[in-house]
């Protein structure tokens, strides 16, 4: 006989280990509505306090994956690979990575999310492109993945519906920051997409959700161990988020930055190092390259030949965007009416910045959400962000604020200027790839 929901909650509350059948039964009730919100909240709090073993977390992830539709790409006969980022500022890596990796052979069915807190969302960026459909029919999604090799869309109602319900409850019960629940939430959606391999970008620094290195490693290790335990070959790179990754933060501005990157104009930057590291990791995981050096060379060829840019343009068009978007982005991406420079406060070197607050500045401009139903102004944000260790003179622009009106842009520019520390000497170079976990 199935265990009553309250007995599952009691067992976990008291520190017991749940068996897969108990977890599966509870999650099935979450998906079909027989578990109440109060019971779901109590379960989440019990997990928050008592934690979960790796095997429990694998069972939770698989149960949430199986609560809805799971995709199968076997008929394509190509490796299926994806990447997930825990989020940061100016992190538009997915936009470039999907077409680069697809140009090398694997298929990349990327199911992405919206902005959360101070971080930007891949879907919000793509919606700055007129006509781009983030919720295509399953048939169109499969057709685009087959023809182009990649498609970036949003989560459908049929993928991991139990996670959608549990996350909404966690959001209002102070249980968002539970490593087992974060792990199962992220991975259930990714595993439902039918992946064979997954690479995780776990951010560390003052622009990430987890600023403590020990906590960051715990989350990264949990994600890697549980995903591998669930049968998906997975690795993680812990990457630096103590400054924006791209030189822009904001939706249309990051799409513009993506096109510049795919056109070969950002080689040698921190952004380039991250994109190439993840492309190499994904290609090796997919078995397309024998080792990472070969994978990076393949990715570089896809970039320099223009094939990755061509695939990005094809993906945009197949999903409803303009056919000539990559040739004429200025005709389609809206520009903010007010652009105001951010002046360096004094001579010296850019030594540090408050990255999270830079993300909040984009939200203040209207480029992100304070509430789930807020409308986003895709035009606004920060551009021309100078990297740390840059030598500047007093009054020299270190960024440009793109705002809906001049008063707003000037107010945000003054705020942004205070978020940078300028020192007499350049700070030590911080590695952009901090570590790798498998």
Curated annotation (Swiss-Prot):
The enzymes which catalyze the reversible phosphorolysis of pyrimidine nucleosides are involved in the degradation of these compounds and in their utilization as carbon and energy sources, or in the rescue of pyrimidine bases for nucleotide synthesis. The keyword Glycosyltransferase applies. Pfam families: Glycos_trans_3N, Glycos_transf_3, PYNP_C. NCBIfam families: PRK05820.1, T_phosphoryl, Y_phosphoryl. Homodimer. One of its GO terms (molecular function) is 1,4-alpha-oligoglucan phosphorylase activity. It catalyses: thymidine + phosphate = 2-deoxy-alpha-D-ribose 1-phosphate + thymine. Keywords: Glycosyltransferase, Transferase. GO terms for biological process: pyrimidine nucleobase metabolic process; thymidine metabolic process. This is Thymidine phosphorylase. InterPro entries: Glycosyl_Trfase_fam3, Glycosyl_Trfase_fam3_N_dom, Glycosyl_Trfase_fam3_N_dom_sf, Nuc_phospho_transferase, PYNP-like_C_sf, PYNP_C, Pyrmidine_PPas_bac/euk, Pyrmidine_PPase_CS. PANTHER family: THYMIDINE PHOSPHORYLASE (PTHR10515:SF0). Pathway: Pyrimidine metabolism; dTMP biosynthesis via salvage pathway; dTMP from thymine: step 1/2. GO terms for cellular component: cytosol. Belongs to the thymidine/pyrimidine-nucleoside phosphorylase family. Disulfide bonds: none annotated. Its EC number is 2.4.2.4.
């Amino acid at each position: 006989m199935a265990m009553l929901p309250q007995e599952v909650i009691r067992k976990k509350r008291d520190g017991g280990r749940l068996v897969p059948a108990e977890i599966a039964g509870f999650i099935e009730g979450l998906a079909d509505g027989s578990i109440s919100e109060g019971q779901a909240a109590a379960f989440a709090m019990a997990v928050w306090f008592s934690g979960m073993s790796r095997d429990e977390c694998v069972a939770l992830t698989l149960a949430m994956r199986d609560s809805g539709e799971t995709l199968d790409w076997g008929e394509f006969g190509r490796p299926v690979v994806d990447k997930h980022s825990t989020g940061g500022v100016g992190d538009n890596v997915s936009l470039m990575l999907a077409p680069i990796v697809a140009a090398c052979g694997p298929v990349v069915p990327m199911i992405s999310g919206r902005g959360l807190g101070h971080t930007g969302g891949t879907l919000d960026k793509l919606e700055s492109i007129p006509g781009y459909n983030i919720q295509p029919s399953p048939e169109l999604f499969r057709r685009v993945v087959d023809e182009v090799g990649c498609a970036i869309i949003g989560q459908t109602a049929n993928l991991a519906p139990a996670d959608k319900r549990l996350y909404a409850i966690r959001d209002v019960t102070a249980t968002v920051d539970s490593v087992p629940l974060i792990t199962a939430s992220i991975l259930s959606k990714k595993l439902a997409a039918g992946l064979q391999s997954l690479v995780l970008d776990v951010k560390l620094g003052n622009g990430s959700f987890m600023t403590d290195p020990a906590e960051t490693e715990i989350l990264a290790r949990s994600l890697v161990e549980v995903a591998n335990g669930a049968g998906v070959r997975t690795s993680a790179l812990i990457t630096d988020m103590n400054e924006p990754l791209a030189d822009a933060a904001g939706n249309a501005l990051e799409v513009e930055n993506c096109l510049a990157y795919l056109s070969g104009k950002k080689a040698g930057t921190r952004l380039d190092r991250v994109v190439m590291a993840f492309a190499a990791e994904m290609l090796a995981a997919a078995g397309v390259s024998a080792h990472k050096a070969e994978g990076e060379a393949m990715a570089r060829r896809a970039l320099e030949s223009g094939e990755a840019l061509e695939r990005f343009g094809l993906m945009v068009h197949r999903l409803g965007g303009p056919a000539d978007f990559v040739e004429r982005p200025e005709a389609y991406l809206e520009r903010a009416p007010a652009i105001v420079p951010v002046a360096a406060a004094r001579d010296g070197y850019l030594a540090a910045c408050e990255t999270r607050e830079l993300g909040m500045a984009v939200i203040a401009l209207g480029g992100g959400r304070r509430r789930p139903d807020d409308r986003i102004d895709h035009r606004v944000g920060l551009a021309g962000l100078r990297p740390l260790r840059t030598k500047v003179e007093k009054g020299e622009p270190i960024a440009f604020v793109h705002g809906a009106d001049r008063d707003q842009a000037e107010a945000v520019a003054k705020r942004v200027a205070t978020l940078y520390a300028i020192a007499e000497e350049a700070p030590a170079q911080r590695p952009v790839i901090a570590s790798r976990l498998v």
